Amino acid sequence: YHYDSPHWNLSVQADVYQNKIENRIVCLPLKGTYTWSMMNYGYTFCRGLNATAQGRYNSADWMFSLLGTLTWQSDVNRTDPDDEDTYNKPICYSPALSSGITSVIGWRNLQLSTSYLYVGERMWSYADPEDVLTPYNNIDMKLTYTHHIGKTAVGACLEVCDLLDEQYEHIPRYPMPGRNYKLTLTFGI
């Protein structure tokens, strides 16, 4: 669905999918966090739903934008029906549920954006069904100012990553950095 007017844009989209993949190559940290190994899944089966909703408002000085995404999927190994340890088990590092929300508020040359990300449980090994990475949430914020002097654009951006300082791991025993800050200055001709 899509709606347009002079000030508003709204859209909603949902896709249902099913994939059967032969010889799927996945890169996994099987020999430590710095040495990744290529793994060939002979046959995988994936089905899921992607949904996106987006809204935007524009006026002379103001801009508001909101984007939401949701993905649910069942992504399983169907290589060897006789292998109880791996058959019909989730593909490593493939979450069943993930979602995100991004909001942007702009006023003239100033813009504040916030993004929220949720990643659900995901297995990281077939060796033990308890080898599950816990779900995590992440919130980032960014404040941007841009000023034009003739044809030259000068800008500054202050970004706070992992605003709530939540500790999480993309791969086992390798925690992502906590809250951190970035300042970016730009000059464009």
Residue ranges and their predicted role:
Residues 1-4, 52-56, 102-106, 144-146, ...:
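Transmembrane beta-barrel domains of outer membrane proteins
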Residues 6-21, 37-122:
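Gram-negative outer-membrane beta-barrel transporters
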Residues 15, 127-133, 140-144:
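Short, glycine/charged-rich beta-strand-loop motifs at protein surfaces that mediate ligand recognition
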Residues 23, 27, 31, 120-121:
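Transmembrane helix-loop junctions in multipass membrane proteins, especially transporters and channels
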Residues 25, 61, 76, 164-167:
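Activation segment
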Residues 28-37, 77, 81-90, 129-134, ...:
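Flexible, surface-exposed loop regions and adjacent strand-edge segments
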Residues 36, 96-100, 136-140, 178-182:
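Transmembrane beta-barrel architecture of outer membranes
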Residues 118-125, 143-189:
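C-terminal beta-signal and adjacent terminal beta-strands/loops
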